[in-house]
């Protein structure tokens, strides 16, 4: 029986994946960098070092990767500072349900801790998470399972009693490799037949996840 729920952040809690995508394309266009739209899906869910590695593998060792990533982060922050962090529908309702019903909760994000804490506190949902594990606190990025295994361990939970809510293929692969129940709430990337065939459970939104948990339909 599920008693532990681990959340990804970008694309699950916050509607930030599309904004990040827009920022990456904007910076790429300003610098005459081609094919960014093609490579971006493989970077969704990765931490800074994994994203940098992916860019260097595609564009070559002379690609100004740190400058590019810093520019995308500055552009992203400018939008957030102006408009705020867009929270996904159903987030607060699901978190309140989990807290009220005694579930353990964690956030496992590929973003750095400073970014994670700032955004969670800005949305007034930091208080709902028992543990937080961030991309700058792990050695191996998603799709490696390290971040989810670390979250399960921090909560002193069991893998068979834990589920992960993700939107990215990298994150879902990490969840499956960790041996926990993998739940997808699609954002930018669609749920494929191949993905469903691996055992990933797909829900259209977070409110439907809440209903499924309430009715004990996620095992």
Question: Where do the model's predicted regions map?
Answer:
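Asp-based, Mg2+/Mn2+-dependent phosphohydrolase catalytic module
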Residues: 1-3, 96-99, 112-219
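Active-site neighborhood of HAD-like aspartate-dependent phosphohydrolases
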Residues: 1-41
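Short beta->alpha linker loops
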Residues: 19, 43, 47, 86-90, ...
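An amphipathic alpha-helix signature
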Residues: 21, 25, 48-53, 73, ...
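A short, Lys/Arg-enriched amphipathic alpha-helix followed by its capping loop at the start of a domain
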Residues: 26-31, 93-103
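Helix-loop "lid/cap" segments that line or gate small-molecule binding pockets
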Residues: 27-28, 47-62, 119, 151-152
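Short helix-capping segments at alpha-helix termini
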Residues: 30-34, 60-63, 101, 124-128, ...
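Metal-dependent phosphoesterase signature
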Residues: 56-92, 101
